């Protein structure tokens, strides 16, 4: 077998985890421009932890807490209660993530309930290396997308959809991740990489991407119903 998901060996390492390895991210994953939002006529300032923006729930988002654990016959359920005003968000929110083994599949189900209108966009932040270790830049990737969301230097969308044809974002045909990244190769450990939203083709449940480990031959296929993938 090959361990294809990055992780740490101790709880202490996870508590100092600045890369969100394997974390439940919330209340809202990704960035909120200017670290504020308006809801029901009220303005809510949030913690600025990514320049002037708010990222992955703030300074102490859901990833920085040890959740309560309930053992199930076929898995486990994690729960925590986020109090009103945590990181600037309104409402007391009770969130749960249930992990279940279904045959050869691991299923994650997210639920959240708040006593006030609020924002909620939970995700899992796992990192995959299909070789089981070393650089992943030699992995071959295909993405079924015609455009990416243009972004500012602060990684905030501008609203413009930029065609991928002829750019480094063109993964319409499978290619190594490192092919169009200047100064990188399959042996590199550091790169600016890709941190962009791909606007996926089609609608409904469909293939979004196919990733292949260059040394292991392991293939991961990503399916989604969403319009984009980052």
Where are these regions (language model features)?
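An exposed, glycine/acidic-rich loop-and-rim segment of catalytic or binding clefts
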Residues: 1-230
